[in-house]
Amino acid sequence: MRTLDQILTKKDYSRKTPASLFYKDSPLWQKLLTIGCVVFLAGAGLGEWKPINSAVGGLPKAISLGVIGLAMLYTLFYPDEKRLRELWKPTLLYMSLMAALFFWSMVIWIESFAAVSSMIRSCSKIVFQSIAILTAVALVYLFREKAIELFTISICIANTAIMLLSIPGYGFAASIQSLVTCLITFGDADGYALQLEIHDLTFVFGQMILYYAVFAPRTTRQEKRKRCLYLLLCCWFFLVGMKRIAIPAVVLFVLIALLLRKRKIPGWFYPAVGVCCILFFLAFLYCVRYGVISRLLNSFGIDMMGRDYLWSMANPYYEFSITYIGRGFEYVDTIIAQWYNDGLINQPYPFHNDILKVFVEVGFPGFLLWSSIQYVLTPLFWQRYADQETTLLYLSELGYMTVTYLTDNTAFYFWSTMALRLVTLAYAMERKKPPEPKVWMPDSRQEIGRACVGKECRSRWSPY
């Protein structure tokens, strides 16, 4: 029997006990979502293992659709209008790049009567790029700023699995020796170490190093420990992948970010940097077209590893002119395959120059569209949506990737595309500017007069 005190105790009937373990944001839901997303991302990343990649190509990347499916399922049962309102503008910005490439390619196809096979190849690349972008958005929708941590864990698991699966083919001792030799000689890869050159994931670890070295939170002891742990892991996998052009690029942009992070920068600075990048690209294309880059690097004894030969072979396929409209998205893959079949090249390697590749494919107008969205409009957006530190993070990540665009094929890598969008968007979630409060403004002097009269009347007749 209850005592009098228990009977007289006021009960709070406003608190509702969840009827199920799966109420919104329950620990069980969050654990299941976390495990599911990590499994999907790690499984998709495992597709970068060379035996799997050689057998089925980029098909395992479609496993990442599971993350999008989880986000849709979660939204179906527990819709969060606030998060949807926060994410629709960045999503629209991200997808505008894909839409621009698609519609401009349609113009080129109609004008040049392109083959159906070329259109299919272009659309498939746009679809995979869209999957990467939407996966990043879905992960941020589910976990906000924690999405960066889960993404890091996933790619670390994938890279570790690839390292372990590659050992039986070479033996444990030979694998360790090959890896040590590669690290000591700064890239003299052979055997096991060559198997670990996972191009896409390696470049992604460079982006993560930039984030954890400069921008990751470090207020509490737990945050400091996590930051140090993930930074060490990313550095390890980054060095194991050993992309020599990426190492100085990471160091350079870490220093730039550290220099600018605490400084007050005028609002026009970052968009101006983007405009300067576009002008640099045009100058770079001119120098590539007329062999200036090749002669300069050869004069210093730098081995271009056949890049100058590929770049010169591309000259008949484009014009350095504002009237050049391009050949269509993914056209370069067509001519590379043609050169390989004709015996002009030993391996069907791409240009190793994504700036040239984009210009050949989408022409001068399309190139300006592609570069303006990424280098000018997106920094402007992040300044308005969040703050300058978010803008600095985006441009630091993009600047690092831009260095690789000049000598590699990273502009449309699946994981690089995903990381570039995910890191900035997740970081912006905690730095997003609150909406401006709405202040009543009178439409006319007559309205002000009526308001004043009403106030006088209330003060005259009010008993208070």
Regions found by a protein language model. Give the residues of each.
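Aromatic-anchored transmembrane helix interface
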Residues: 63, 90-103, 113-141, 150-156, ...
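Hydrophobic transmembrane alpha-helices and their immediate junctions
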Residues: 153, 157, 269, 361-402, ...
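A membrane-periplasm/extracellular boundary helix in multi-pass inner-membrane enzymes
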Residues: 164, 168, 258-300, 316-319
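Transmembrane alpha-helices of multi-pass inner-membrane enzymes
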Residues: 209-213, 395-405, 409-446
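Alpha-helical transmembrane segments of multi-pass inner-membrane proteins
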Residues: 149-176, 195-260
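N-terminal signal-anchor transmembrane segment
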Residues: 2-80, 100-109, 166, 401-403
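Long extracytoplasmic/lumenal interhelical loops at the membrane interface
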Residues: 298-362
